[in-house]
A protein has these predicted regions:
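Terminal, non-catalytic protein-protein interaction segments that mediate quaternary/complex assembly
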Residues: 1-289
Length: 289
């Protein structure tokens, strides 16, 4: 995909060397953005082999709302480095996507949803939580029938909670995304505080593009664009040679995604099929923990 290769080249040409917590220095840039037209195909990278099944298991783990990887690690090991022996994570994206904590004590002048809100439930421990994904789906559907919500601009999902993020071992990197409708096309914009261009960004691109396709199908929209802003877009120094190799490879035709005719919350791993995917060989990159 040309947009990805353009990003790699830009960071290699313009990045500034930075030290970081991992012990492996990076070359970094500020606020890199790109767009992909999802109507032209599924943007799974072809200039190296991508492990689609691992990404798909990760996406369904997010959508499960689980705060641990006990089930995920049976399918893929991509989160093992950040979990404890029992599979617990200090931060889990899906936990906030589907179960964002709702305060029951408000500051003066503030209001919060309660159990009368259709997207709020109470956990076994008594905590009120908000299902942001269901809110997005219900709002997008209502926009088709309710003139007061026809051009909604409040379809935002947040995985960042300051009280958690300031003490977590690895707070969310891709921490917020928003949906937007133009005509009958559903668009998604992802904001990421930190992006590992060799390893993380290809997965993020594939994951959120697929999520956009799934929600568009559920809500009766055509797929539009996926836009991505990475605040600290960086390349680890031990990834440079592999990425230079990737730059020499010509992108191949984009693949397609087939989604089963089921409701969004009934979809499983087997209901998402990758079609016509061809790629160049694997390029191995070490994970910086």
């Amino acid at each position: 995909m040309k947009q990805y290769l353009d990003m790699v080249k830009y960071v290699l040409d313009n990045g500034i060397k930075k030290e970081n917590r991992t012990g492996v220095d990076t070359i970094s840039t500020f606020a890199y953005s790109y767009k992909v037209d999802l109507s032209k195909g599924y943007p799974l990278l072809t200039t190296k082999k991508m492990y689609f099944n691992s990404m798909l298991h990760e996406l369904f783990w997010y959508l499960s709302g689980e705060e641990h990887i006990k089930n995920l690690r049976k399918k893929t090991k991509i989160w093992d480095a950040w979990a404890d022996e029992e599979g617990r994570l200090e931060t889990a994206y899906g936990r906030f996507w589907r179960r964002y904590p709702v305060p029951e004590i408000s500051l003066d002048g503030e209001v919060f949803a309660d159990e009368n809100n259709p997207w709020v439930t109470r956990e076994k421990n008594g905590q009120l939580v908000f299902d942001q994904i269901q809110y997005i789906i219900d709002t997008l559907k209502e926009m088709k029938t309710n003139p007061n919500h026809k051009n909604g601009r409040r379809m935002i999902v947040l995985a960042w909670n300051p009280g958690n993020a300031t003490i977590s071992k690895l707070p969310p990197c891709h921490y917020t995304f928003a949906f937007n409708v133009l005509g009958n096309k559903l668009n998604c914009h992802l904001t990421q505080r930190s992006g590992d261009i060799a390893l993380g960004i290809p997965f993020n691109l594939a994951c959120y593009s697929l999520l956009t396709m799934m929600i568009a199908k559920e809500c009766g929209y055509e797929v539009g664009e996926f836009a991505h802003t990475i605040i600290d877009a960086h390349i680890y120094e031990n990834h440079i040679e592999g990425l230079k190799e990737q730059l020499t490879r010509e992108p191949l035709k984009l693949s397609k995604i087939r989604i089963a005719d089921k409701s969004f919350n009934e979809l499983t791993f087997e209901d998402i099929v990758l079609e016509d995917y061809e790629s160049h060989p694997v390029i191995k990159f070490e994970v910086a923990v």
